Amino acid sequence: PLDGFMMGSRTGTLDPSVVTFIMEKEHLTPSEMDQILNKKSGLLGISGVSSDDRDVTKAAAEGNQRAQLAHDILEYQISKFIGGYLVALGGCDAIVFTAGVGENQSHHRQVVGEYLKFLGVKIDPELNEKMVLGKEGKISTPDSSMEVYVIPTNEELVIARDTKALVEKL
């Protein structure tokens, strides 16, 4: 589960030749390399602080350059993936930020909005700041080319609904 943008302790998408290069250079076993890719990379590996973005955010605010670099990379990667999907889909009506970072880190959403500004995406800074800690709502400006929302994740509800649907088929 490494594909996509960088996660708390996972690399996200990377060039496969990097894996063998590092293994050979550092004399690592496949198991050791797997641990690095899945448990010691991502925000943790780059920041050197934590896999929890709240800790990385605090460190970046205190001037930790590695923590800031981790944020810069994460925001770039999120923007790149949104851009890639916009091309694949031929556009979209809305962008939705969800899950831990998407729901609770307004600064990441604001930076991603800046990356997407050339597409006409506009995030309202005041609305964006208000949409944290379980709040749900629209954060784009009225003249944005796409609507942008923050919607909290409810994985337990999805699991419960899927389980109910499966049980009803028995």
Task: Tell where the protein language model's regions lie, with residue ranges.
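Glycine-rich phosphate-binding loop plus the immediately following alpha-helix
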Residues: 1-51
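Adenine-nucleotide phosphate-binding core of ATP-dependent small-molecule kinases
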Residues: 42-46, 53-88
